[in-house]
């Protein structure tokens, strides 16, 4: 293959006409290579090389990330290379070409032409420009400065290209020689636009060298346009610099306090035309100055500011540095759009890849949302409450993973996803900068700098849509997450009979499940308790208070008395599904959702206003209403007896559309059981992952072993006047009135016989003073 060298390239580099690849991407020949050692770090290897354009020779320094090319023999004397990234800088009076990235066009070739050392360039001021390797000179302070400069990541070895599954929107994946300029920015700079995997840092900035203006008479002001350099060329050694980039993300302005005082801070992320990303941080007065000026999606010219090592615990961008702006920094908006700078850049990994990734890694992932849970409120260790919403994401790798949204994501993107799923649409979701965690399997969670894109318009999303419509709906997926968490803990759909059959709650940790059931009965003799209203931070104390007898209430925890107490729900409910019934307890938030009225208002209706009719009407509306109950099931010790207690942590009205999809999904998983999408249970009790368990085995017969179960719920001495009527149900259906099988108590022929006043009669109550709907006796409200 015949390769021509770029004529005159060395002369232009020596004269300062060409300082970076933005001005020219020359093809040169390496005529000599020599290994040198840095004086301050002898263990660090560097290679100095001599470059030729066929006429002149010039010294260059190879980036340390390219040392392997020399060691492998890919780069050697005689090799012809294309300098895809370089910086020409003056060190101790000599202009040195620092090459952090190059492309080897030909490994070995005869020396082309008869190159000689170049003449003295403008900046040299009479210094000798002869090409020779001098050990003393190589270890001088000037070279030491170069040796300190080391790109943070490996560059492309022979042919730069975007690695892995990374993508940008839009982005080119092949080199191009198209030049571009942005007239509105006032810089008039042309550069080559090609996409490649960029290094994180570059040693020196290509600034107009001051000596070029020497001997030209007095100059009052330098009116030269700013020299724009790539983001990845920035380093702590950069002096005057200007970058042109798009804001891809902006954090909120936050207040902070430390031993040095209080302050405020915000940051934003930048992306330039070469795919370089960097974070910019502003503090205090600088934050006030620039916060309103920065808008996500806009283009800016940013100059001045200091570079410091990136704090990788908080900064996920692929750059070893971040910018800190100060009072001397300038930000100028570019009002004319530059299509060469993408709006977003992704480095997608498949869900299958996540399985082998480490905990706390930051990942970009894209997939189809197959299901989503409602928003729940989680109380953190510091007492603050935060919303949480979970969804399942699947892709073409045959794997699915739980994605957990926190904070504002739940109400914005989360609500939109919920609406799409409820309407029968399976949207595409792209997650940028999600954090991997290993709690209950692999999960992906949002962090402060995460971004969510619903049905985005780029190639990966279109491929996923086509795959899902073509075959993805019926393809089984293995979940990397153990269970689908919808209420802050491991949360799976179960039947009431499974609570007893599977002995849920008896392990060291509680079980968190969802049960779709109907409220059969409510106990209302003590439906609320008096609570402390004193605020503890942003939450009320809510501990029980006692009446002092003088119109005040005392809280032992707060050690204070208050003039007025609060009232909070503590409801005892009996719920039933198609397999069994049980007792549960619902506290304040869940109680208000069920009753539709606050505990205080209901207390006043019953005890202050004595409005029995209104009270009964409220109760009547609640009875025989179906909900999705999210339960915490845990065994507790009461009076030296072990008892399993179920507490309602969240209650949602039944969404028939979503529930139908859940049923259909469960049926699909049953059909694809052989593909390991679900664990196979020969006893027919595999309701995990939203699979409905009817108690019928694969042979079509009921499993007699499922009839055996232990007692659950309240004991007789705690169950009101009639004791505990709730025997286990399991796979068989039996009547609680006559004890026979084949029908439920609500349809029992014996239930029509007159009973004692207020006795439970299989779904309705009948008293000697007459019967009425709603499942509660008029004279015995609050007793079983």
From Swiss-Prot:
GO biological process, one term: DNA replication
PROSITE patterns: ZF_CCHC
Zinc finger extent (C4-type): 532-558
Organism: Arabidopsis thaliana
Full protein name: Replication protein A 70 kDa DNA-binding subunit E
UniProt cross-references to InterPro entries, sorted A to Z: Euk_RPA1_DBD_C, NA-bd_OB-fold, NA-bd_OB_tRNA, Rep_factor-A_C, Rep_factor-A_N, REPA_OB_2, Rfa1, Znf_CCHC
Residue ranges: DNA binding: 241-327
Coiled-coil zones: none
Quaternary structure annotation from Swiss-Prot or TrEMBL: Heterotrimer of RPA1, RPA2 and RPA3 (canonical replication protein A complex).
Transmembrane segments: none
Region of interest (Disordered), residue spans: 114-224, 678-707, 746-784
Cell location: Nucleus
Family: Belongs to the replication factor A protein 1 family.
Gene: RPA1E
Keywords: DNA damage, DNA recombination, DNA repair, DNA replication, DNA-binding, Metal-binding, Nucleus, Zinc, Zinc-finger
GO cellular component, one term: nucleus
Highest taxon, organism lineage: Eukaryota
Molecular-function GO term, any one: DNA binding
Function as written in the Swiss-Prot or TrEMBL entry: Component of the replication protein A complex (RPA) required for DNA recombination, repair and replication. The activity of RPA is mediated by single-stranded DNA binding and protein interactions. Probably involved in repair of double-strand DNA breaks (DSBs) induced by genotoxic stresses.
